């Protein structure tokens, strides 16, 4: 019978790791930029924005009485053959008493200014939030708990857990990722279920294309490392690396479509955004060791919480419904189409038709990127446009470095 001091082990449940990100600083800096990312008009000469709710971005650091400010129009231009041409305006939020219109009182009439206030806000008070120094702080992602701008405006999705390292990732993604335009309000919770998966897959493909090529030997090494360190190389199926998909036990994530497409399935990229890092898994999990005849088995129990107000909440729920115990199934929108009578016949030497000559497709010239917007501007315009960060198309999304698994590759 063993005796001695307690080993320090506990049966207490593992901590719940919640999704989130850096909070907006409570005190401003010497910069004069908005703390928040911009909303952008979809068309030239769009009217000022109208909001379903208060129009004040979420900021849990402020009391309800301080939740008031103004949206200010920022004219934008981009270079063209004739010099430059205007592009749809951007609108930035500032708290009352801060920013370019710091001398105005709440409600003072001025062109290009839209005043907003939350319920119960003391609009006679002036904020001590200050403004942002772009060299020290990133823009804080926009979230509206009570409704965002009308359908004439959109904004780019920025994850709440993006750090400063996310700026270069977002810029590189913006430079290479362009997707078709869509209808509906950009960034609203109700419009976030459209083609997020396709955008995520596009980012992965573009980064693979831009990065160093993975040789056949490297891919084979990635797929045959120690099991817990394996990653799926391009062109590999899930079951080639992690074994057949199952139900009700380990290896139960992934439907037939995900198994076939591997990492090119955008749902993989989306869910990697919720997977814990190595450190989080080790220090945030409940670790259970068990000696077995074949060796030591370590079990890691980890919980990631996706808040219900997360813009991608419905997408994560949908992916889980499709992929957990999903072997033998496919997404409803990916059911194989029935083959026509002529194409369903097996081809033979005598009956196979001669292949039609394919027309060569013209290569599309890459469009000029929006990050050239500040070129050919005067020094004064450069200063006023200094805060135009993350000036991406509606389809650009940055999942963050951890979601792309670059440390594993």
UniProtKB/Swiss-Prot annotation:
Family: Belongs to the gammacoronavirus nucleocapsid protein family.
One GO CC term on file: ribonucleoprotein complex
Species this protein is from: Turkey coronavirus (strain Minnesota) (TCoV)
Chain positions with Phosphoserine modification: 190, 192, 379
Assembly description: Homooligomer. Both monomeric and oligomeric forms interact with RNA. Interacts with protein M. Interacts with NSP3; this interaction serves to tether the genome to the newly translated replicase-transcriptase complex at a very early stage of infection.
Protein name (database record): Nucleoprotein
Domain CoV N CTD as annotated: residue spans: 215-331
Molecular functions (GO terms): RNA binding
Post-translational modification remark: ADP-ribosylated. The ADP-ribosylation is retained in the virion during infection. Phosphorylated on serine and threonine residues.
Biased composition (Basic and acidic residues): 180-192, 247-258
